[in-house]
Amino acid sequence: MASSLMSNAITAVVGASGAQANMVAPFNGLKSIASFPVTRKSNDITSIASNGGRVQCMQVWPPVGKKKFETLSYLPPLSDAQLLAQVQYLLNNGWIPCIEFELEHPFVYRENHRSPGYQDGRYWTMWKLPMYGCTDPAQVLNEVEEAKKAYPSAFIRIIGFDNKRQVQCVSFIAFKPPGY
């Protein structure tokens, strides 16, 4: 393509009159790279990213003795005030709070298949019905307290369900039994 364009340009220059031939400069090829100043950059990425001189390495989650559950599972257990704030957040988003509990297998496991995916084998039992029409986060925490009294050795979680999109939007552990 480029060679055909160049040959057309040369034909046009050769066939043109003398006044027009002087207007188009001939193609001399690419300029030598030696004429351009070149700065060599190292491949060291530590010079690019900086945290202000404070070098600290973050620990990874210990794989023994501490299991991961849902959203916020890396944090210490939430206080009542923090739980109220989380429930208020899901109410502000228009999600329906729902309380679920699990007695035997709160951790991720696969009983019937080994493929990874959203369905990881954890089916929790719903505590009562979803709290449609709930506007007060204290109502949700009262239900969590009732579930704790009924099943003191159960894991209890709060989920936020979006009934318009028919999806679970948030899920977090509200109570872990002693020893976890």
Curated annotation (Swiss-Prot):
| Reported function | RuBisCO catalyzes two reactions: the carboxylation of D-ribulose 1,5-bisphosphate, the primary event in carbon dioxide fixation, as well as the oxidative fragmentation of the pentose substrate. Both reactions occur simultaneously and in competition at the same active site. Although the small subunit is not catalytic it is essential for maximal activity.
What is the top-level taxon of the source organism? Eukaryota
Question: What are the protein's GO molecular function terms?
Answer: ribulose-bisphosphate carboxylase activity
Record's miscellaneous remark: The basic functional RuBisCO is composed of a large chain homodimer in a 'head-to-tail' conformation. In form I RuBisCO this homodimer is arranged in a barrel-like tetramer with the small subunits forming a tetrameric 'cap' on each end of the 'barrel'.
What are the record keywords, sorted? Calvin cycle, Carbon dioxide fixation, Chloroplast, Photorespiration, Photosynthesis, Plastid, Transit peptide
Provide a GO CC annotation, any one: chloroplast
Q: Which SMART domains match?
A: RuBisCO_small
One GO-annotated biological process of the protein: reductive pentose-phosphate cycle
Transit peptide range is 1-56
Q: State what protein this is by name.
A: Ribulose bisphosphate carboxylase small subunit, chloroplastic 3
* Location of the protein in the cell: Plastid, Chloroplast
Q: Which family does it belong to?
A: Belongs to the RuBisCO small chain family.
Q: Subunit arrangement?
A: Heterohexadecamer of 8 large and 8 small subunits.
State the organism named in the record: Amaranthus hypochondriacus
- Predominant location of this chain? plastid
